[in-house]
Amino acid sequence: MLPLSLLKTAQGHPMLVELKNGETYNGHLVNCDTWMNIHLREVICTSKDGDKFWRMPECYIRGNTIKYLRVPDEVIDKVQEETSKSRSDRRPPGVGRGRGRGDIGTKPGGRGIGRGQDDGGSKGGGGRGRGGIGGKGGIKGGGRGRG
């Protein structure tokens, strides 16, 4: 479970935030962003020593000042249910389009330089611009352009 998905789910729930400087903030999470900046409402701020309290209607806390967050257990359970549900909805890896050809060895030869004489070459020559047996003798190049 990722911290940001936990915070997104915790919107509207009460939480405790402790900052690196020791202050704590108790309030209801309104919003959070990708930098873990959070917006709380109905906040009670407690000083580092725990002897001073402030009540604020709302506050904004910068994400890099946060030491830890205490989130209700119901939110954690909800996030775990959502992640397990989304994992069960996914296809297993390697199923569907885009995971290789799947028919290697069933068709003769491919295209390009790596093709040999006997495995799918039309008139020999091994591909565009290559001489060789049955090719254009001493003429270099692919037969296009000047020269």
Swiss-Prot record:
Compartments in which it is found: Nucleus
PROSITE patterns to which the protein is assigned, alphabetical: SM (PS52002)
A Gene Ontology molecular function term of the record: U6 snRNA binding
Biased composition range(s): Gly residues: 122-147
Classification via SUPFAM superfamilies: Sm-like ribonucleoproteins (SSF50182)
Start and end residues of each Sm domain: 2-75
Name of the featured protein: Probable U6 snRNA-associated Sm-like protein LSm4
Region (Disordered): 79-147
Pfam family, one: LSM
Source taxon at top rank: Eukaryota
Regions crossing the membrane: none
Biased composition (Basic and acidic residues): 79-92
Keyword field contains Repeat: no
Any GO BP: P-body assembly
Keyword Ribonucleoprotein in record: yes
Role description: Binds specifically to the 3'-terminal U-tract of U6 snRNA.
Annotated source species: Oryza sativa subsp. japonica (Rice)
Oligomeric form and interacting partners: LSm subunits form a heteromer with a doughnut shape.
Key words, A-Z: mRNA processing, mRNA splicing, Nucleus, Ribonucleoprotein, RNA-binding, Spliceosome
Family: Belongs to the snRNP Sm proteins family.
Cellular-component GO terms for this entry: P-body; spliceosomal complex; spliceosomal tri-snRNP complex; U6 snRNP
